Amino acid sequence: MWGTAMDISADQAGNWAAKWEQSFNMNHDQVMEIADVINYLGNNYATTAAEIAESVNEAASMGQITGVDPKATAAIAASMQAMGVSADVTGTTVKRIYTNINKGSMATAKQQQAFARLGMTAEGVAKAMQVDGTGTMLNIFEAIGKLPGEQKLSTLNALFGQWAIEGGAKVTQNLDLLK
């Protein structure tokens, strides 16, 4: 049924549902809630439910480890895609952001400097992600957005990595779309 709503085949919908039940450790009803959120986002953002679902399939289980609910991963993916980040890049971008801001004591010196620029610490962010991953990410994007223009790109690069700059920059500059 949600295959029709997302304009994907029943086989693809069933495939994703089965994978999500396993990888997200959820039951069928919980997976259907995610599908409903994805369908809503696809209907209300400049992207499609199928593109969002593809990114969720790629990044949401990593998001769960870092403290971000799969529905929030869907919202992050939809926001990036609505701002022009291609669907095939979004999943990788989201995974890189999750990985890089959760290094804690293993963060590089440049990452630690970037967090300090934001008034944060790598260890503090990693711990905060486990309590409220989505809220912590919003705080990071908001803090980057408040930096002087000449510091934004280098901070995005240090925190998220070169391959996630585009998505991170677009979310930072259009944070209301994510909220």
Feature names for model-found ranges:
Residues Y45-A46, G63-T66:
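Short coil/turn linkers that connect adjacent helices within long alpha-helical scaffolds
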